[in-house]
């Protein structure tokens, strides 16, 4: 069997109904769209949230909150991710070079998820209390 010889099983594919081809087809005249109305017209698509002209829910409710710009340039990384690195010195440049964080990230915090078995040096990164204890227990240090 080759890819160019494969075909669907008999009866697996249904031919599509041809619309507007006489009343004998079952889909003639109005082509299954009913009579008149907004949805019977061509080019019709009622957008999500449309409530028939009444002010929709997303406009009746007040706005709240905002998106912090800081969230786009900060991230957290797990302690387990650091154990994948070969370098003993961990800083922002090292993490970007190893593709652990995107290039646009400016601030990183190391959190305690997973464990680390070798001594590493963390330079100019924020570290949670638990991660700090784990790094120091493995013989590493935080600068």
Swiss-Prot record:
One Pfam entry name: Ribosomal_L27A
Keyword NAD: no
GO terms under biological process: translation
Ranges of biased composition (kind: Gly residues): 21-31
GO molecular function terms noted in the UniProt entry: rRNA binding; structural constituent of ribosome
Region listing for Disordered, in residue ranges: 1-48
Basic residues biased stretches: 11-20
Annotated Gene Ontology cellular component terms: cytosolic large ribosomal subunit
Keyword tags: Ribonucleoprotein, Ribosomal protein, RNA-binding, rRNA-binding
Keyword rRNA-binding: yes
Family: Belongs to the universal ribosomal protein uL15 family.
Subunit note: Part of the 50S ribosomal subunit.
Protein role: Binds to the 23S rRNA.
HAMAP family membership: Ribosomal_uL15
Protein's recorded name: Large ribosomal subunit protein uL15
Native source organism of the sequence: Baumannia cicadellinicola subsp. Homalodisca coagulata
Lineage: Bacteria, Pseudomonadati, Pseudomonadota, Gammaproteobacteria, Candidatus Palibaumannia
Gene name of the record: rplO
